[in-house]
From Swiss-Prot:
Anti-inflammatory antagonist of interleukin-1 family of proinflammatory cytokines such as interleukin-1beta/IL1B and interleukin-1alpha/IL1A. Protects from immune dysregulation and uncontrolled systemic inflammation triggered by IL1 for a range of innate stimulatory agents such as pathogens. Glycans are attached at N109. The keyword Secreted applies. Gene3D superfamilies: 2.80.10.50. It comes from Sus scrofa (Pig). Belongs to the IL-1 family. This is Interleukin-1 receptor antagonist protein. Residues 1-25 form the signal peptide. It is found in: Secreted. Transmembrane segments: none annotated.
Length: 177
């Protein structure tokens, strides 16, 4: 009996080692997370799309609606998430640029990110739901929130003044069907 318990424990440890990206979402004993696709648009109805390798927000109509980027999400903890696009192959990250924080897309596979890695913290966002809207604060840059400009077709970025009326930090965030 003791040998079978040891073998079972060893087998579980081995499988966790092999499939760390699938199990990084939750501690032992919980079902592993999977990447899920979400639609995102700001409270002014601007959707995200890619233009010249930059994520922008604008009003897409007619045949252009197919340009809308779905946001790939891997939950890390109840309110912490990794965000990506293109099947999780490009991930949103917060990096310091001078005195400002900058949002950038990095060619990293979202399922390779690990929740306890200090180097992966720049990819982590804190999801806060308030009624029908959601905001995303950078875990690496506290106080900096994912935002869109008031004008259409401008880059998606970060702001440290989420209450100011010059940037939009509230989004509708809906799982894609």
């Amino acid at each position: 009996m003791e040998v079978s318990r040891y073998l079972c424990s060893y087998l579980i440890s081995f499988l966790l080692f092999l499939f760390h990206s699938e199990t990084a979402c939750h501690p032992l004993g919980k079902r592993p997370c999977r990447m899920q696709a979400f639609r995102i648009w700001d409270v002014n109805q601007k959707t995200f799309y890619l233009r010249n390798n930059q994520l922008v927000a604008g009003y897409l109509q007619g045949p252009n609606t197919k340009l809308e980027e779905k946001i790939d999400v891997v939950p890390v903890e109840p309110h912490f998430v990794f965000l990506g696009i293109h099947g999780g192959k490009l991930c949103l990250s917060c990096v310091k640029s001078g005195d400002e924080m900058k949002l950038q897309l990095d060619a990293v596979n979202i399922t390779d990110l690990r929740k306890n890695s200090e180097q992966d913290k720049r990819f982590t966002f804190i999801r806060s739901d308030s009624g029908p809207t959601t905001s995303f604060e950078s875990a690496a840059c506290p106080g900096w929130f994912l935002c869109t400009a008031l004008e259409a077709d401008q880059p998606v970025g970060l702001t440290n003044t989420p209450k100011a009326a010059v940037k939009v930090t509230k989004f509708y965030f809906q799982q894609d069907q």
